[in-house]
Each structure stands twice: as C-alpha cells, then as structure tokens.
Amino acid sequence: MAQFDLTRINCQYLDRHLTFPLLEFLCGKEIYNQQELLEYILETVNKTNMIDYTMDTRKRLNLSQEMPEELVQRKAEVLATLKQLQNEVAPIMKATDILKNGESMKDSKTFVNALQKDYNFKVEHLESAYKLAKYLYECGNYQESTSYLYFCLIVMSPNDKNYLNVLWGKLAAEILTLNWNTALEDLTRLRDYIDSANFSTIQALQQRTWLIHWSVLVFFNHPKGRDLIIEMFLYKPLYLNAIQTMCPHIMRYLATAVVINRTRRNALKDLIKVIQQESYTYRDPITEFLECLYVNFDFEGARLKLHECQTVILNDFFIVACLNEFVEDARLMIFETFCRIHQCITISMLADKLNMKPNEAECWIVNLIRNARLNAKIDSKLGHVVMGTQPLSPYQQLVEKIDSLSMRSEHLAGLIERKSKQKNQESIDSWKYY
C-alpha cells in the first residue's frame, strides 16, 4: 500500500544511517520495485564509509562478486584515516576507559581536572575525539562511537560549536545500537537543549521537527514511550505546533500511541480535536478510524478502516510491532463506543462490527468483561450482551483535569516567553538609532 507509506517523507528528517533500517524493512515488503530500492540503498550507503555494506548491496544487485578497485582503494583510505585519528586520540584512550567504568567520573569538573592532571589533556585532544567519534559513526561502528561522543559530552562546554552535533550524534548512535534507556536520556537532554537554546523561530522549528521524527524510533521501543509520546506530541504546545506546521503525518504515530495505551484514554478527546483540525492536510486509515468512531459514530466505516489500518501498520517500520495490540485495542474502542449507545446488543451484531465470527466474538467479550471488569452480562441463550452504566472514575477525571491544566499552563508560559523576547528585541532595535 504505497499510497499510505511514509518512509520517503520520514527519511527526509532522519540521519542517513537511521534510514537504513527503514529501507531494509521495505526490502522485505512488496510495496516498491526491489531493484530500484536496492539501487537507492547503494546510492545512500556510498555516501558513508561502510565499505562492507556497500559491497554486500552490490552483490544483492548482482553487480559483482569481487570488490572493485575503487572500493579497495576507498577501504584502504578509510582504514588509514581511522588509524591516524586513533593515534591523535591515543593520549586520552585510557581516560575514556575510566569514564566507561567509573561512575564517579560522570561529574564534568572532576573528570576534566583528572584529565589535565593525569593525562596532560589539551583542547586539541577534544577536537580529535570529536573527529574520531564522527568517523567511527560514518564507518558504522556505532558502539565505539558512543564512547567518544560521551567523552565529548562530559568535557565539552554547551557553548562549544560542536556540542549540538554531539548531542544529535549520541542519540543516533544509541538508537542504532538499540540502547533504548540511554537513547531516552539523550533524547531528553537534546530536547532540553533545543528548548533553552537561543535559536531563531525557524531554526527552533526545524530542530524540533527533526527531533520529533527521531523520537518516534525511541518511543515505540521504550517501555515508557507510549506515555511520553503523548505528553510530548499532544501536550507540549511547541511540539504540537511543529507537527501541525511541518509534519502532520506524525499524527499517525500519535494516534497509534493513544489507541494502544488504555491508561491514557483521557487523551482521546484532545487527539480527536487535533485530527479534525489537521484533516485537510493529512488523513490515513488510522486517523480516519478514530474520526469514524468518535466523530461520525459510523461503526461500519470504523470496521472497514480497521481492516485498512492493519495493512498500513504491517508496512510501517515504526509501528509494525504494535499490530496485534492495535487491533485488540481498536476492537475494544469499537465495543466500548457501541455499548455507550446501545444498552442491549446481540453478539452477532458485535461480531460483525469487530470483524470476528460470533463464537470468537463471544469468547472475546467474556474475556474482556472478566479482565477489564466491565459492568455487563451475557445472555448466551438469547445471544445478547446487556450493558450496565460505566461511570468515569475519580482518578480518570483527575488525570483529565491535570492534563488540561498542564497544557494551558505551558501554552501561557510560551506566550509570555515570546512576548518577553519580542519586547527585548524591540529594546535592542531602538538602540540602533542612537
């Protein structure tokens, strides 16, 4: 279903190395021409120093079984440059080992003092460590690259010209080595830096747009990610504004997170508002499923869209692992919404709405009532499900109010900050005439 594939647009906001898992994932699907896809991978990998990956891709394209002279020469150059950079960093190699093993060295001042005292540390060493980290990353040696990037983060001043690049590089390397806990820490650190940095409005918007795309990789792989993606994308006005302005297609991932997160059903109301606002710029089966169900109360439409959702998710690298969960929770949403409207429902009617056989639907409803403690009874003889009232718990009411107040407070804080910056700028401009 190339119509709803977001790989092309997502790759525009990802580092070159982060696109490879997405492209390799597509190779296992039948969405695009395999030859053209492999040619694009080869074109992309040629811009890196991953010679072995380049050779492997050439073999898959049946170009050659032997390494061309050009690649042999490039590999020799890469190894020579790598050795040269490692020699430049040699004086602080032991220091990076201490940093990896010693928790006490995580304090920046302590570590820098130890470097200067014990290793005769100089500014040139920091520049060499940065260059080596970047080069290792370009070679695909992400694990080793993280050690030097971490070293740079500890030693560098946030005002250093390379500090922002190190933050982005560290996050990318942790994602590519599947270190999700560390990746989340790096994501938070980078977000805090972007939010507090003195960027222009356009620069800040661009930085947040890139961060939004990178963060999707982290959020759908971290245990706490399903809550964090909702908080960041839906309840942080600066990031919601970036989504609405630059990348409304991210609504797919926000909507998916809300559907599979049963503890955050309170976010549905706010999500539906945003989906309706952005429906003229972006729609897909996932957002349309929620519109059918919660705006139009079109259960037949929701049933058809749920079927389309399965195909979309199956072909989306970011959320493919959520497929079974999404289908289960989407059925639950249909069931809950249908039950709010009808007090007495036939099992055959529910089975039709849920794309299930009557026997399967009855077992599913029995388990649902037992596990979710829904106030309902099943009359097997008549084939009816009789619903009781399901009041909103005080906890859910409290969470809804807190989220609403938090969003309003952050919006007001952003408004005050923008007015303050504008006032300061006017004051600075007025001095130009004296």
Curated annotation (Swiss-Prot):
One of its GO terms (biological process) is formation of cytoplasmic translation initiation complex. SUPFAM superfamilies: Winged helix' DNA-binding domain. Residues 219-392 form the PCI domain. Pfam families: eIF3_N (PF09440), PCI (PF01399). Keywords: Cytoplasm, Initiation factor, Protein biosynthesis. It is found in: Cytoplasm. Disulfide bonds: none annotated. InterPro entries: eIF3e, eIF3e_N, PCI_dom, WH_DNA-bd_sf. It comes from the Eukaryota. One of its GO terms (molecular function) is translation initiation factor activity. GO terms for cellular component: eukaryotic 43S preinitiation complex; eukaryotic 48S preinitiation complex; eukaryotic translation initiation factor 3 complex, eIF3e; intracellular membrane-bounded organelle. Component of the eukaryotic translation initiation factor 3 (eIF-3) complex, which is involved in protein synthesis of a specialized repertoire of mRNAs and, together with other initiation factors, stimulates binding of mRNA and methionyl-tRNAi to the 40S ribosome. The eIF-3 complex specifically targets and initiates translation of a subset of mRNAs involved in cell proliferation. Belongs to the eIF-3 subunit E family. HAMAP family: eIF3e. Component of the eukaryotic translation initiation factor 3 (eIF-3) complex. The eIF-3 complex interacts with pix. Interacts with mxt. This is Eukaryotic translation initiation factor 3 subunit E. It comes from Drosophila ananassae (Fruit fly).
